[in-house]
């Protein structure tokens, strides 16, 4: 299990890289990761030295979407809170006053695809796939 669900770095001057880091779960987003993403992106957007934000995944994978294992035993209130924080994350990116770039590898599924589509620019590997499996899972499209 990765110690830090989100890794921050500065690959170039004035660029904040926010990497989803849950390789054991194909970078699926659980509550801890969602909160860490919101915190990291908020910090980056409030930093006047940051002029662009790069969102990516570690270990050659962008994001497998929401962590289904963490949703199985979720109460109605927890599900509502999850949806609200997911919407907050999307709104942060949508209303950002700096360019948001998503670098995708392998796949962006469900909520991961939603994160990618809200970006200003997407850079995707040749074999990258986007998928929206909500209906097959009995879910509604949720993050945007």
Would you name each region that the model predicts?
Residues 1-58, 91:
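Conserved CoA-thioester-binding segment of acyl-CoA-metabolizing enzymes
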Residues 3, 49, 57-92, 108:
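Glycine- (often His-adjacent) and acidic-residue-rich active-site loop
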Residues 18, 55, 67, 115-117:
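Hydrophobic/aromatic residues within transmembrane alpha-helices
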Residues 21, 66, 105, 127:
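Histidine-centered beta-alpha loop that forms part of the nucleotide-sugar donor binding/catalytic region
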Residues 47, 96-97:
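Acidic-histidine catalytic/liganding microenvironments
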Residues 89, 93-95, 103, 109-144:
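CoA-thioester-processing core
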């Amino acid at each position: 299990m990765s110690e830090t669900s989100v890794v921050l770095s500065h690959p170039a001057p004035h660029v904040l890289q926010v990497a989803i880091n849950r390789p054991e779960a194909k970078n699926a987003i659980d509550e801890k990761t969602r909160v860490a993403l919101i915190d990291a992106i908020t910090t980056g957007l409030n930093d006047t030295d940051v002029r662009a934000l790069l969102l990516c995944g570690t270990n050659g994978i962008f994001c497998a979407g929401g962590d289904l294992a963490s949703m199985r035993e979720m109460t109605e209130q927890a599900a509502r809170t999850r949806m609200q924080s997911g919407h907050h994350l999307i709104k942060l990116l949508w209303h950002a006053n700096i360019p948001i770039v998503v670098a995708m590898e392998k796949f962006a599924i469900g909520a991961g695809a939603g994160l990618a589509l809200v970006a200003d620019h997407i850079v995707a590997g040749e074999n990258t796939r986007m998928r929206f499996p909500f209906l097959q899972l009995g879910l509604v499209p949720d993050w945007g």
